């Protein structure tokens, strides 16, 4: 069955046909689909890429490991989609990549995806000592992105990620709230101010 579904993706001869074929393959939820779903991320078909990302997220850790082993260093579009999948999976093994991409990647779409992912890590998969150290790194990177990234969409993502990081990183909640408060009053973009203010308000209310 999976062989036929994979063949259908490879044989698709239209954008709509590719989306349908990828959707069918994703719905099968089989690890055999992972290489093909990853390859779709490099196609110039955003609709198919969205479906492939969703399929990879459903497959979890095996998909994350495959993405990490096959990351496209040259196609920034494929890299951004791959990081969106990693963000959705929350795989702790992806943390080094997410941290470096959030800080250093030239592509704003990659930085935004990586920043978003730093707030969605499966912290329960790490030991307490590793968890505390990695959460500190995430906070410092997100703070850097929130304050200094030149693209407002990345700063917006950083504010959202700090909000989702805070409940798991109780030792950092005061620092996170202070960082959000500062940005709510200083960012040049009103959308970032508003998102920072919303995150701070939700944290204060325990939402």
Curated annotation (Swiss-Prot):
SUPFAM superfamilies to which the protein is assigned, alphabetical: ARM repeat
GO molecular function terms noted in the UniProt entry: lyase activity; oxidoreductase activity
Sorted UniProt keywords: Antenna complex, Lyase, Phycobilisome
UniProt cross-references to InterPro entries, sorted A to Z: ARM-like, ARM-type_fold, PBS_lyase_HEAT
GO cellular component labels: phycobilisome
Subunit structure: CpcE and CpcF associate to form a lyase.
Task of the protein: Required for the chromophorylation of the cpcA gene product.
PANTHER family: DEOXYHYPUSINE HYDROXYLASE, PBS LYASE HEAT-LIKE PROTEIN
Family named by the database record: Belongs to the CpcE/RpcE/PecE family.
Name by which UniProt lists this protein: Phycobilisome maturation protein
Species annotation: Synechococcus elongatus (strain ATCC 33912 / PCC 7942 / FACHB-805)
Lineage: Bacteria, Bacillati, Cyanobacteriota, Cyanophyceae, Synechococcales
């Amino acid at each position: 069955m999976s062989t036929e579904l994979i063949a259908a993706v490879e044989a698709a001869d239209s954008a709509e046909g590719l989306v349908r074929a990828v959707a069918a393959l994703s719905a099968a939820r089989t690890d055999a689909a992972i290489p093909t779903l990853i390859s779709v991320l490099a196609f110039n078909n955003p609709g198919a890429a969205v479906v492939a990302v969703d399929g990879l997220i459903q497959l979890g850790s095996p998909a994350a490991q495959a993405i990490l082993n096959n990351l496209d260093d040259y196609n920034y579009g494929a890299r951004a989609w791959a990081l969106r999948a990693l963000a959705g999976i929350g795989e702790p093994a992806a943390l080094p990549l997410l941290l470096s991409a959030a800080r250093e990647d030239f592509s704003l779409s990659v930085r935004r995806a990586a920043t978003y992912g730093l707030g969605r890590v499966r912290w329960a998969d790490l030991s307490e000592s590793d968890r505390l150290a990695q959460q500190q790194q995430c906070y410092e990177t997100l703070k850097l992105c929130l304050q200094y990234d030149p693209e407002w969409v990345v700063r917006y993502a950083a504010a959202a990620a700090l909000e989702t990081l805070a409940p798991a990183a109780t030792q950092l909640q005061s620092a996170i709230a202070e960082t959000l408060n500062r940005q709510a009053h200083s960012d040049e973009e009103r959308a970032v101010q508003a998102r920072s203010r919303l995150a701070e308000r939700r944290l204060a209310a325990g939402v």
